């Protein structure tokens, strides 16, 4: 099974590389690069596995005794393990460049098993390193390379997560032209549907759901808002479903109960068996330019496009607050349900 793998260089990327002799052969020389450990911990929580790939010139020769290397190397691994970080595999080439060996980066001989058996997902794997050879290795593996030094570890984290659990979706009909972009790990928020109150409600999903959300909609508002609201729901639902991918590791279930002067609740299950239970009554026919009857239709269309079972309920006096409560409750339940909390699929059937 293909995995999301980070192929990580060691010296100059994970730990500092001494400029004097380019060897970490004593404990005194062992220093971690800034933010390397917290970044790897966060990426681990998103299901990434780690593989170390390092060139160690002349390892095992009199100029670089293996026992000196291992003292610092084993200490580094012990520290990482104590923080919850372990490498699935460690590959080290001990040769000098002029030996023209088959294993030295950017050649791929050390990773032959990964290539032969397709053990890494090319779309969701990366090479992280500080040298041009690391970037060439990335190209040889068919994955994206992220160059440390040009990017900090925090910037590397953002680059990886922005490309992971993200999706774009476009829906074009004779009635509407809609573009949606979702990043479940957070990001830019920009919503323009031509219906101001609807924009305000969709913004609640982004802000309280902790997701990046960009929506642009050009619809036949000269007729009414029905097609725009319905098609935005369908496009948004399809985009969220696409961003979730195989759903491995997600919590799957979400429940929220925001309470102001009104009480709103939402229960959600990414079961791929769409269903909506909706209990809400409004005094007004419209909130701004949005018909209150379209709120139920929005969530109906959204639940079917997402493939979720959705239960929504609200009680209160103020119609604006009730509508906002429904969208906030949905957002909080969504945030809970899409959170990565394990390495497994949350289903005894093995599929959702």
UniProtKB/Swiss-Prot annotation:
Alphabetic keyword roster:
Amino-acid biosynthesis, Cytoplasm, Histidine biosynthesis, Hydrolase, Lyase, Magnesium, Metal-binding, Multifunctional enzyme, Zinc
- CC cofactor: Mg(2+); Zn(2+)
Reactions the enzyme catalyzes: D-erythro-1-(imidazol-4-yl)glycerol 3-phosphate = 3-(imidazol-4-yl)-2-oxopropyl phosphate + H2O; L-histidinol phosphate + H2O = L-histidinol + phosphate
- Tell me, what is an example of a GO biological process annotation in this record? L-histidine biosynthetic process
For the region Histidinol-phosphatase, what residue ranges are annotated? 1-164
Q: In which pathway does it act?
A: Amino-acid biosynthesis; L-histidine biosynthesis; L-histidine from 5-phospho-alpha-D-ribose 1-diphosphate: step 6/9; Amino-acid biosynthesis; L-histidine biosynthesis; L-histidine from 5-phospho-alpha-D-ribose 1-diphosphate: step 8/9
Report the EC number(s), separated by commas if there are several.
3.1.3.15, 4.2.1.19
Q: Name one GO molecular function term.
A: metal ion binding
Q: Where in the cell is it found?
A: Cytoplasm
**What are the annotated GO cellular component locations?**
cytoplasm
* Binding-site list for Mg(2+): 9, 11, 130
Task: Tell me which residues bind Zn(2+).
Answer: 93, 95, 101, 103
In terms of superkingdom, the source organism counts as: Bacteria
Q: Which residues form the active site?
A: 9, 11
Q: Which family does it belong to?
A: In the N-terminal section; belongs to the histidinol-phosphatase family.
Q: Which NCBIfam families does the UniProt record give?
A: HAD-SF-IIIA, hisB_Nterm, Histidinol-ppas, PRK00951.2-1, PRK05446.1
- HAMAP family membership: Bifunc_HisB, HisB
Q: Which PANTHER family match?
A: IMIDAZOLEGLYCEROL-PHOSPHATE DEHYDRATASE, IMIDAZOLEGLYCEROL-PHOSPHATE DEHYDRATASE HIS7
Could you identify this protein by its name?
Histidine biosynthesis bifunctional protein HisB
